[in-house]
Regions:
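Extended hydrophobic-aromatic, low-complexity segments
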Residues: 392-396, 404-408
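Active-site bordering "gate/hinge" segments
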Residues: 1-391, 401, 411-412
């Protein structure tokens, strides 16, 4: 007799979701649905509000990556008001965003992913959690994970007032600067973060890559999906988290598209299905081809593995060295092994730490010129960043008083 299996809620993920499996008369899977069953409504209830309120509202979309929404909103205001942040303000923003990348990637790896890789997929489900991870790696490492996240959240809090859910985003700049006294503890935090990033990658090699079972799992054909990939890159096609062009490569790794974030709606299509509240994004020129991978797909993937697949190189030397090792292990580029996303995540955290070491030494960081007030409303603004789990777009339109008349969000 046909029946249905429901897994609700799904745990250890960012947000809420459930899985429904429909079985045929023989008990085999006939269909499967991954559902986001909650209506968020941010695109609607923000209408009628002043645009400058968005950096205070949208961090509440997510408790894991509020800084990504905050920064996308702030950059959308830059575009809306036709203003570029000052060089010092941009440095401070990148410092904060790298700090967020570091603490966010480690909450994902150690709290959400490591229970499967470190504790093990065959362990008792009651042990597959952060306490089980600490039981395996030791209290000292557990305390380091907490410390690296706390210290980087202190940077976020110092610049934008709160962590999580920062709220100080301003068009053309930042709400406060960095003093020379601040620079000292920021340098210490950056150095500690770099040391921890190298340790985390070595831990992954020691625990995961030295275990044939895990390596076979990562390389297993069942966990490969051939799709297009999307991410931000700089002018040299290196991975950029804060800014740059949106680049798309095809399943073979060749460049398919490259465009300004402001033109995203010419290249990205949004599809809806009756069984989920989430929008299903695809490459507009290819049309909606359904949830299929391989030949004929119009789907693109984002997040850390996509970031490394899209970029010709990382921006920092240690991260680039680790990316080469990863692709050599996976059999070349692009890599379609979904489980390798966790490895790529640690490499992205390493780049963020390397960049903050450099930013902390930059003489311009302590400049008092932190706001460009040459604002000119142009009624439309789009902001884009690489959220930890992928390319994020915020699109705002206003009337001549700066009151929102349209909000569209493409959330990774």
């Amino acid at each position: 007799m046909a029946r249905k299996i429901t897994i609700d809620p799904i745990t250890r993920l960012e947000g809420h979701g459930k899985i429904e499996l429909l079985l045929d008369e023989e008990g085999k899977v006939k269909d499967a649905y991954w559902q986001v069953a909650e209506l968020r409504g941010f695109e609607r209830f923000c209408l009628g509000r002043p645009a400058e309120e968005m950096p205070r509202i949208v961090p509440n979309i997510c408790g894991v990556c509020p800084s990504a929404h905050h920064m996308a909103a702030t950059k959308a205001l830059d575009d809306l008001y036709s203003v570029e942040p000052t060089p010092a303000a941009r440095l401070i923003r990148e410092l904060e965003y790298n700090a967020f990348y570091i603490e966010d990637h480690y909450i994902h790896f150690f709290f959400l992913a490591a229970p499967d890789f470190v504790v093990g997929p065959h362990a008792d489900p009651k042990e597959r959690n952060i306490l089980g991870v600490i039981g395996k790696v030791g209290t000292e490492i557990g305390l380091k994970v907490i410390e690296v996240r706390k210290r980087n959240r202190d940077i976020i809090r110092h610049i934008f007032g709160k962590a999580p859910h920062p709220e100080g985003g301003l068009p053309g700049g930042v709400p406060r600067g960095i003093s020379e006294q601040d620079r000292k503890w920021i340098k210490d935090t950056a150095a500690f973060s770099l040391e921890f990033a190298q340790f985390a990658i070595q831990l992954f090699k020691d625990v995961v890559l030295s275990n044939k079972y895990y390596v076979d799992l990562i390389l297993n054909e069942a966990y490969k999906l051939k799709t297009y990939y999307m991410a931000l890159v700089d002018e040299d096609n290196r991975a950029n988290f804060y800014d740059g062009k949106v680049r798309v490569v095809d399943p073979e790794g060749a460049e398919y598209l490259k465009f300004d974030a402001r033109d995203y709606d010419q290249y990205i299509g949004e599809w809806v299905e009756p069984w989920t509240y989430i929008k299903l994004n695809h490459l507009r020129k290819l049309g909606w081809q359904g949830l299929k991978e391989g030949d004929g797909t119009s789907l693109y993937r984002v997040a850390p593995l996509a970031r490394l697949n899209v970029a010709d190189a990382m921006q920092s030397p240690l991260a680039q060295k680790e990316a080469v090792i990863m692709f050599d292990t996976l059999g070349g580029k692009p890599a379609h092994q979904t489980l390798a996303t966790h490895w790529a995540r640690l490499i992205c955290a390493l780049q963020a730490a390397e960049q903050n070491v450099n930013i902390a030494d930059d003489p311009q960081l302590t400049s008092k010129d932190i706001r460009n007030m040459n604002l000119k409303l142009k009624n439309k603004g789009v902001g884009c960043v690489e959220a930890p789990r992928g390319t994020l777009f915020h699109h705002y339109e206003t009337d001549d008083e700066g009151i929102l008349t349209k909000v569209n969000l493409i959330v990774a």
